[in-house]
Amino acid sequence: MLLLPLSVLLLLTQPWRSLGAEMTTFSQKILANACTLVMCSPLESGLPGHDGQDGRECPHGEKGDPGSPGPAGRAGRPGWVGPIGPKGDNGFVGEPGPKGDTGPRGPPGMPGPAGREGPSGKQGSMGPPGTPGPKGETGPKGGVGAPGIQGFPGPSGLKGEKGAPGETGAPGRAGVTGPSGAIGPQGPSGARGPPGLKGDRGDPGETGAKGESGLAEVNALKQRVTILDGHLRRFQNAFSQYKKAVLFPDGQAVGEKIFKTAGAVKSYSDAEQLCREAKGQLASPRSSAENEAVTQMVRAQEKNAYLSMNDISTEGRFTYPTGEILVYSNWADGEPNNSDEGQPENCVEIFPDGKWNDVPCSKQLLVICEF
């Protein structure tokens, strides 16, 4: 602190020349010991002094700590959009990625158009018998059926017990005179005549037939034979019926009737001939139960079938093949109408719903026979 005032005083009392030298010397002395710059404010501007010697470079001090960052400046305005650059070259094809998960199932599509009708398949094997259907309502009393054909003779039955003698029947009406019978047995001897001449010895006669038993036993035996004959006929008819049915596959049984089909499709006349050769006739349902049995066969075969009835003899009057009028019918609404573009409809078909319709007899329909 004392050095500074003394320096000022020396400068003021010394001549300029010596002052400059002394200052130089003093400055050298001062600068040799410390890097201190002395600033003097002259009272008047003197002559410029000589250039002083370059001072030694002082060593740099340690770098100070960085100052705290200043506040962020405001964001500048976005620049203009540059022009679109040229399209780059295509890159190399990458490897296939992994298979993705299966997507959800789409909604079902619209039904396609119906395909053409395929050819008829082969006849399948006979299926197992179905469960018996419910008992149908009692139908109206049927007409008298046609006489059946003569059946095969059945086996001889066991000898039955002797029946009770029957009552004497009323005398029958006198029959027509029959042909001359054989020579009867010798009559009773007449009155003794006069003795004749002795004749030759005759040949021995044949043994006569055994005489009949009493009248009551004969009547009882006849009654017994009549009963056995009735049983035999029923047995023969049933045996013949089942024998014919077995030879004709795929059928339904209702009461004493059996309906069968072989799956054949024919005209009415050919269908009649086929059933006739099988010793049967076309299906003739006479009750709702029989009609239902035929309907089930129509559904199973998926084909309409012929029935036996027709009005070929009298238009509008449908009858059975025997000529009897119908005792049961199940016509569809508005049928029979005899309308097929001018072609007469004299025959009957049955639909899968059991309803009947009149059709031309030339139509090809399923054949169902009745036994």
Swiss-Prot record:
<dbReference type="InterPro" id="IPR001304">
    <property type="entry name" value="C-type_lectin-like"/>
</dbReference>
<dbReference type="InterPro" id="IPR051077">
    <property type="entry name" value="Ca-dependent_lectin"/>
</dbReference>
<feature type="modified residue" description="4-hydroxyproline">
    <location>
        <position position="153"/>
    </location>
</feature>
<feature type="domain" description="C-type lectin">
    <location>
        <begin position="273"/>
        <end position="371"/>
    </location>
</feature>
<feature type="signal peptide">
    <location>
        <begin position="1"/>
        <end position="20"/>
    </location>
</feature>
<dbReference type="InterPro" id="IPR016187">
    <property type="entry name" value="CTDL_fold"/>
</dbReference>
<keyword id="KW-0176">Collagen</keyword>
<keyword id="KW-0106">Calcium</keyword>
<dbReference type="InterPro" id="IPR015097">
    <property type="entry name" value="Surfac_D-trimer"/>
</dbReference>
<keyword id="KW-0465">Mannose-binding</keyword>
<dbReference type="GO" id="GO:0005581">
    <property type="term" value="C:collagen trimer"/>
</dbReference>
<feature type="modified residue" description="5-hydroxylysine">
    <location>
        <position position="198"/>
    </location>
</feature>
<feature type="modified residue" description="4-hydroxyproline">
    <location>
        <position position="195"/>
    </location>
</feature>
<comment type="similarity">
    <text>Belongs to the SFTPD family.</text>
</comment>
<feature type="modified residue" description="5-hydroxylysine">
    <location>
        <position position="87"/>
    </location>
</feature>
<feature type="short sequence motif" description="Cell attachment site">
    <location>
        <begin position="201"/>
        <end position="203"/>
    </location>
</feature>
<comment type="subunit">
    <text>Oligomeric complex of 4 set of homotrimers.</text>
</comment>
<feature type="modified residue" description="5-hydroxylysine">
    <location>
        <position position="141"/>
    </location>
</feature>
<feature type="modified residue" description="4-hydroxyproline">
    <location>
        <position position="147"/>
    </location>
</feature>
<feature type="compositionally biased region" description="Gly residues">
    <location>
        <begin position="139"/>
        <end position="148"/>
    </location>
</feature>
<feature type="compositionally biased region" description="Low complexity">
    <location>
        <begin position="71"/>
        <end position="83"/>
    </location>
</feature>
<dbReference type="InterPro" id="IPR018378">
    <property type="entry name" value="C-type_lectin_CS"/>
</dbReference>
<keyword id="KW-0677">Repeat</keyword>
<dbReference type="InterPro" id="IPR008160">
    <property type="entry name" value="Collagen"/>
</dbReference>
<dbReference type="Pfam" id="PF01391">
    <property type="entry name" value="Collagen"/>
</dbReference>
<keyword id="KW-0430">Lectin</keyword>
<feature type="modified residue" description="5-hydroxylysine">
    <location>
        <position position="159"/>
    </location>
</feature>
<feature type="region of interest" description="Disordered">
    <location>
        <begin position="47"/>
        <end position="215"/>
    </location>
</feature>
<feature type="modified residue" description="5-hydroxylysine">
    <location>
        <position position="99"/>
    </location>
</feature>
<dbReference type="Pfam" id="PF00059">
    <property type="entry name" value="Lectin_C"/>
</dbReference>
<feature type="modified residue" description="4-hydroxyproline">
    <location>
        <position position="78"/>
    </location>
</feature>
<keyword id="KW-0732">Signal</keyword>
<feature type="disulfide bond">
    <location>
        <begin position="275"/>
        <end position="369"/>
    </location>
</feature>
<dbReference type="Pfam" id="PF09006">
    <property type="entry name" value="Surfac_D-trimer"/>
</dbReference>
<feature type="modified residue" description="4-hydroxyproline">
    <location>
        <position position="171"/>
    </location>
</feature>
<feature type="glycosylation site" description="N-linked (GlcNAc...) asparagine">
    <location>
        <position position="337"/>
    </location>
</feature>
<feature type="modified residue" description="4-hydroxyproline">
    <location>
        <position position="111"/>
    </location>
</feature>
<feature type="modified residue" description="4-hydroxyproline">
    <location>
        <position position="108"/>
    </location>
</feature>
<keyword id="KW-0325">Glycoprotein</keyword>
<feature type="modified residue" description="5-hydroxylysine">
    <location>
        <position position="162"/>
    </location>
</feature>
<feature type="modified residue" description="5-hydroxylysine">
    <location>
        <position position="63"/>
    </location>
</feature>
<feature type="modified residue" description="4-hydroxyproline">
    <location>
        <position position="132"/>
    </location>
</feature>
